[in-house]
């Protein structure tokens, strides 16, 4: 999408790019950055996703795909914000016990951002030696709160509804 780190905006140009992607893939759920975070791109990106998701459901906003075909309106049913740097209260916690190691492996794919004892780069808050331990500890704590090994907390833009108490753990 070619959004510039630190300098993208929640404006028509960037919203239309997000709308094109939403209409192409037609997701029911979108997971995006926290609405409040240390890094300025995270809350900006979060709000951009929320607004573009709403706009993607409006028929009067016209977009075309990469082959110049007119796209149909589509609005995701749910937007969930994962929790990043700040200790935000989740609206719900998902049991990720069976997937925690996979998540940590995925996080480590961005190795240049995290602790490397051989790095000559200046230290950042997420490149400290203990940052990945913090990520693990948060998953352990969220898991503790719902009685499982590991949990992932999310913030929802709307109230969550359930049709059965059997869905709750």
Locations of the language-model features?
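A conserved beta-strand->alpha-helix junction
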Residues: 1-6
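Metal-dependent de-N-acetylase/amidase catalytic core
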Residues: 9-169
């Amino acid at each position: 999408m070619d959004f510039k780190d630190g300098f993208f905006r929640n404006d028509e140009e960037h919203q239309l790019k997000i709308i094109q992607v939403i209409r192409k893939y037609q997701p029911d759920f979108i997971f995006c950055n926290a609405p409040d975070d240390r890094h300025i791109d995270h809350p900006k990106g979060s709000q951009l996703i929320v607004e573009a998701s709403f706009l993607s459901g409006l028929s009067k906003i016209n977009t075309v795909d990469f082959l110049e075909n007119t796209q149909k309106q589509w609005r995701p049913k749910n937007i969930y914000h994962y929790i990043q740097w700040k200790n935000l209260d989740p609206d719900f916690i998902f049991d990720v016990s069976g997937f925690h190691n996979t998540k940590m492996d995925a996080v480590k794919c961005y190795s240049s951002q995290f602790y490397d004892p051989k790095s000559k780069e200046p230290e950042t808050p997420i490149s400290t030696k203990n940052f990945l331990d913090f990520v693990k500890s948060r998953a352990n704590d969220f898991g503790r709160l719902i009685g499982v090994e590991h949990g992932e907390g999310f913030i929802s833009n709307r109230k969550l509804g359930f049709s059965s108490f059997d869905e709750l753990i």
